[in-house]
């Protein structure tokens, strides 16, 4: 199992950075606490918590969670998940690298998002205004994630060293 998966946070309180989105009283934290989240797109650099936040949302809301990578998925995969989601109220579809989907692939999501069959969470490192088609973008809220600062990175590394079973066996000093 890759280190990123072994140390992935499981709650908003474990997540480092992104206080503007998930800190106490923030808009996204309130939505999660109220159990009502909109379809959304997380935009930010690699390693800022886009996938982690999506997983935390699904775990917090205890709803079915489907995950696709736009690098390898196609319209058929999207349609299969939408069909499954019709029998699973509140289902979340997380699409990593959503900017890699072409217009047709993005259009396949429209009806299901509009009807509330799925709640879409997309993740992208590219500006969604240019990479996500306007019809889909208009049905989503865009949240911008910021790079972690040096203090947060050190805290993350120290936490990994302290908690990870493999790293615990090494003599690592920061």
Predicted regions and their residues:
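A short hydrophobic beta-strand->loop->alpha-helix junction that borders the nucleotide-binding pocket
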Residues: 44, 66-74, 124-125, 145
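Short conserved motifs of the RecA-like P-loop NTPase core
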Residues: 168-174
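Short glycine-rich substrate-engagement loop in P-loop NTPases that contacts/grips substrate
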Residues: 21-26, 63-95, 102-103
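A short, basic N-terminal segment
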Residues: 1-34
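Conserved catalytic/switch belt of AAA+ P-loop NTPases
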Residues: 32, 95, 104-138
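Walker A/P-loop
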Residues: 1, 30-68, 82-86, 110-115
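Conserved AAA+ ATPase "SRH/arginine-finger" region at the nucleotide-binding site
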Residues: 69, 141-154, 173
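Conserved RecA-like P-loop NTPase ATPase core
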Residues: 15, 42, 51, 58, ...
